[in-house]
Amino acid sequence: GASELSVQNASHSRTFCFIEDAVEMIVRLSEHPESVGKVLNVGNQAPEITIGNLALEIVKIMKKKMTIVPMDGPTHSPSRRCPDMRLTQQLIGYDPKNDLATGLRRTYDWYRVNI
């Protein structure tokens, strides 16, 4: 049988940004004169994915048979987090190079080797 994986707030949605892409955005923004004094988001606007579906994607990468069991989580957690990247994009014109699947795979591979 399949193992169970408990996932809090499985219906909440998020976007994710691979660290290399975040660092590249921060460096470019720090060097851009028009970014001074502005509040700018660093992240990814898409794809937006539920925490439950994210868990399913990770389980697939791990090649495990697991059943996702949704659980209640903290009530103060926002149900949706998706940054508005328009101003950052306008200033530096940067699109993240690592899509979600690549970022998850690279993170999983790193953990397998290092943890």
Where are these regions (language model features)?
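Conserved donor-binding loops in enzymes that form glycosidic bonds
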Residues: 12, 44-45, 93-94
